[in-house]
Amino acid sequence: MAGRQGQPSLNAKPVAAGTRVAQRVMLLAKTSEPERLRQHGARIIDNIGDIYIIDTPVTGLEAMSRERGVERLEAGLPCTALMDTTATITHADRLWDAIIPGRDATGLAGRGVMIGVMDVGFDVTHPVFLGEGGMPRVAAFWDQLDTLQTGRPVEGTDTVYVGRQYLTPDEIKAKAFSTDSRLTAHGTHTASTALMIATGQTGGITSVEDMHSRYAHPSKREGATLCLVSNYTSDGRDAVSDERRSLYTTATDILGFKYIFDRAAELSMPCVINFSEGAHDDLYESRLYCEAIERLTGPGRIICSSAGNEAYKGTYMAKPQGRERAGAFIATGSNQAFYTIASAEPPTVELTFYDDSQGKRETVAYDLTRLREYPDSVELDTINTPTSRYITAMVIYPSCYDDGRYATELLVMAPDEKTLPDAISIEIVGRENDIEVYASGGWFRADSHDTTLSSFTRDHNILFPSSARGVVCVGGTAYRTGLTNYKGEWMSSDVGREGRRMSYSSCGPTMAGLTKPDIMAPGANIIAAYNSLFMEKNPDDASRRWNVMEFDYDGRHHAWNSNSGTSMSSPVATGIIAQWLELCPTLSPSDIITIAANTATHPENDLTYPNNMYGYGQIDAYAGAMYISDHYTGISSPALPPSSTVETWYDVAGRRVNGMPQRPGLYISSGGKKLIRR
């Protein structure tokens, strides 16, 4: 289905005659007989047990999928990048010089720990990344978009895969920038945030000038080591040629995670990876991706990922059993909107097109039960209104999370327009059906054409892979409401105050019914390093107004920049976890959740924790370290707190239910969705 985040549209321009079209794609494949993959032209790049990362011809996919020994083939679209006093707020600064019971060393700075960052737009010439002698504090740098011959090939089992890698300090210093740095500065900000939180300097930071004096020069202070992977996202289409774009999928990202963990293993280091990217969750399940993540992570191997910035808009609509219908208006910034519908039985969907020029409306009803009768479970339709031509597309399949429930994907688009020209409402109908609708490419809104259609909420919008088990999902809190930029101008950015959730920080539950986020960290107006090449190539970009200081170093013009989003929250948590891994190198993802359950601060005391707004609360570096010192050093995996074993029920809006639900309907309990029948 078109309309998924980053997916080419149905109205994409036709390929010109003679244009070279991509013939190979990167996939995850599960099989105990890898030779069956090779028989169809696949090249095995790497493997995680019986999950293989392969580069294979598109023409051989159908035959490969029929092989009895091949259990599953899977590839998803690339993710999208999500966008001081932070160390003091989280108490990370107290660990920089803390006396930890039972330890000879003073302070925690991530010594002997690798911080991996897979992101876009790296600039390692910024002095925050430089260690003694002015050399980068980076153990390895894999630029997946690099086509230059100056770097080393990335050796796979049978082939040299995408990009080039840089492994020595001299190579990394000469590399300087990721290939996409002219397009984005995102990774420079996230990587420097994680590094500064982990390593710190003596004492607290009280001003931008104080931060500049501590970080704007090569540091002799010991601390965490970086490993960088520059990946492809749907934002950076200009960085990759059309014929190579199919080589960059979720399988390529798994390869990036494995690359970082492998480099850490070579150096005998525990590792925490930051991933400030995400894509909309789905109901057909990225099963192999999630299984690969679970195999890659474990003691001393942790992935932190940003929750998403989706809660500023309507993203979820529910119609409980016993109610005839629910509805809202379609909203999108493009010419198409995309929604995922989950229900025990396929419902009826009504789309109403409002023609303001003639004061008319036209309603089209789709009985989704008939989709099951079609061989390919797909239906396409064309609707002509007085103002435009619309195409609708629908596909139905069993939901991967609930036995007996269906998922229907619905696309509405105006192929001849840049935006949807008419007001369009969507209503789901069926009194006996519990129905959920997720905004997967677009959102819901209210409209004066029919004020009764406003059944949406701003939750159920945690992005993938943060929605997956085994990934530490980080939401964002806010303290600053603005700042003064390098020109002396006040820049207002009020998305929350007093440590409460940023207004747009994504909320759970996930499509699988998991309570997410797991933890919170500051994410509003976070000051960190800025990409100097991006600034050079885009001197008038609006993001430059958020520079709080600009300065020259080693022949380049650098800056400290303020940015906001859960992209910034995740590396704050990553830096703190690097401190904890120095104290106890065997911490696992489940250990991080346990520590948070016992030590995180609660921004809103009237709530029950964990919940789908804050998870277990805001990460507290110092309290967590004290807890580790008392409970974890030398202990591989203590049990979860007793309270976490109590069965708690929530409705699909995330509201807690007292005791066992008495009314029939769809509920969430024990980490999954459950249907209570009459």
Residue map of PLM features:
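Autoinhibitory N-terminal propeptides
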Residues: 1-105, 114, 234-235
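C-terminal subdomain of the subtilisin-like protease fold in secreted/lumenal serine endopeptidases
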Residues: 14-17, 270-272, 277-279, 283-285, ...
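Protease zymogen maturation seam
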Residues: 66-114, 124-128, 150-159, 170, ...
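Subtilisin-like serine protease catalytic core
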Residues: 100-251, 268-272, 285, 298-300, ...
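Active-site core segment of subtilase-fold serine proteases
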Residues: 122-192, 202-208, 219, 267, ...
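Hydrolase catalytic cores
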Residues: 199, 229-234, 258-271, 300, ...
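Short acidic, glycine-rich surface-loop motifs adjacent to enzyme active sites
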Residues: 229-231, 255-284, 306-307, 425-432, ...
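Residue-level detector of functionally pivotal "anchor" positions at catalytic/ligand-binding pockets or at interdomain
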Residues: 628-653
